[in-house]
Amino acid sequence: MKVLVIGGGAREHALCRSLSLDPDVTALHCAPGNAGIAEVAELHQVDALDGAAVTALAGRLGAELVVVGPEAPLVAGVADAVREAGIPVFGPSGEAARLEGSKAFAKDVMACAGVPTARSYVCTNPAEVDAALAAFGAPYVVKDDGLAAGKGVVVTDDVEAARAHANACDRVVVEEFLDGPEVSLFAVTDGENVRPLQPAQDFKRALDGDEGPNTGGMGAYSPLPWADPKLVDEVVQSVLQPTVDEMRRRGTPFSGLLYAGLAITSRGVRVIEFNARFGDPETQVVLARLKTPLAGLLMAAATGNLADLEPLRWSDEAAVTVVVASHNYPGTPRTGDPITGLDEVAAQDAPHAYVLHAGTRAEGDAVVSAGGRVLSVTATGADLTEARDRAYRAVARIGLDGSQHRTDIAAKAAGA
């Protein structure tokens, strides 16, 4: 099978790594990719938001499956263009991707499907914002209605900060604060059938102890030793299947990866948000534990044959990923700094630990930083303690001037 992956982050590196290990994959391509993906896939320069260009590239390569990684191309309808050319594509239509592209749309779908979520108001002017903030009280939760690379949400006790964030957006969703730990659960769907993956937990704040501003994610781990063993089945029945059914009822079936961001509250499971693609950095730990070949799973979803797929197989091992970010992230990051220690990790820590590239590029023989989140250092182990130790041992080998990372990823879950 010839596969083309669209994107260039650590999520896409994780996807490409798993696909490169799949014996059914005979040729692997990625556009635009990054310095790490270049080691496992042939790279192509293309505008990931240009559906016609992506479709032309897929046709030229003879791709039998196209996997669209990031949210922006999905919302822009890239999967539609590929699908219209008769090429199987893993990723929802632009209309279905509105589940992520518009939080107000997602709230409407959840209301119609009876999916449990936070009470909320959609606000388009300061008066509506003030009324909503007063209705719910602190902590205030204000979400940009559109895409914001994981940084469009403000949770604060400061009403002025909440107002300022709302006023900087065209339309916001103001909602009640949900207590309890957060869980990310991915499900592969062909628009009718749902296959859940294993749950993970990510760390959204920039600093240890969940302090600092929100980011795209600073680390993740799986499995969740503290979670109810029935959690996945419960979420499939109360959240994922009803949402997929409602999207199909609306005439916009959702095919691809449906990501439910959940809060395990004192009143039960509540949906915080939906995403229309694999999450980053959770994908790094979930795929590290998936034993079922990835290409067949994605192809089954892309072609409507998920019901025929055998049950997914999982490793009993734990996985931890730690994100190494540039100086000043999540503000404007410093880029162009050389990265050292990558060969050392490959020589001394493989196969239990490895580095997935995000914001990197090749510059001569060197690899340099090219974005905010630069690397995802991922490790597996018999339990979270071993996986965590291996991940941080590998992180310590990496040199990047001014870089930052959290030191407490999976610490509480591992009992550290």
Curated annotation (Swiss-Prot):
Enzyme Commission number(s) of this protein: 6.3.4.13
Record carries keyword Kinase: no
Disulfide bonds: none
GO molecular function term, any single one: ATP binding
Cofactor: Mg(2+); Mn(2+)
Cofactor info, note text: Binds 1 Mg(2+) or Mn(2+) ion per subunit.
SUPFAM superfamilies tied to this protein: Glutathione synthetase ATP-binding domain-like, PreATP-grasp domain, Rudiment single hybrid motif
Highest taxon listed in the record's lineage: Bacteria
UniProt keyword list: ATP-binding, Ligase, Magnesium, Manganese, Metal-binding, Nucleotide-binding, Purine biosynthesis
Domain ATP-grasp: 107-303
Gene3D superfamilies xrefs: 3.40.50.20, ATP-grasp fold, A domain, ATP-grasp fold, B domain, Phosphoribosylglycinamide synthetase, C-terminal domain
HAMAP family to which the protein is assigned, alphabetical: GARS
Family of the protein in this entry: Belongs to the GARS family.
UniProt name for this protein: Phosphoribosylamine--glycine ligase
